[in-house]
Amino acid sequence: MLSWALTFLIIAIIAAVLGFGGIAGTAAGIAKILFVVFLVLFIISFIMGRRPRM
């Protein structure tokens, strides 16, 4: 899953350089969604890892 996120990040950077339109705009949108998903997963794993084990 992380490899897909990196792939879409690279595509989004190329799209930003060339201008957002068509497939480039779609790739940038997917990259933004993946960024938010991974950010939420990071925060959840950070909070769960800090809890004392019972």
Curated annotation (Swiss-Prot):
Record InterPro entries: DUF1328
Regions crossing the membrane: 4-24, 28-48
Cell membrane as UniProt keyword: yes
Protein's cellular compartments: Cell membrane
Pfam families: DUF1328
Bilayer topology annotation: Multi-pass membrane protein
Domain of life: Bacteria
Alphabetically ordered keywords of this record: Cell membrane, Membrane, Transmembrane, Transmembrane helix
Keyword Cytoplasm: no
GO cellular component, one term: plasma membrane
Membership in a protein family: Belongs to the UPF0391 family.
Designated name of the protein: UPF0391 membrane protein Pmen_0080
Native source species: Ectopseudomonas mendocina (strain ymp) (Pseudomonas mendocina)
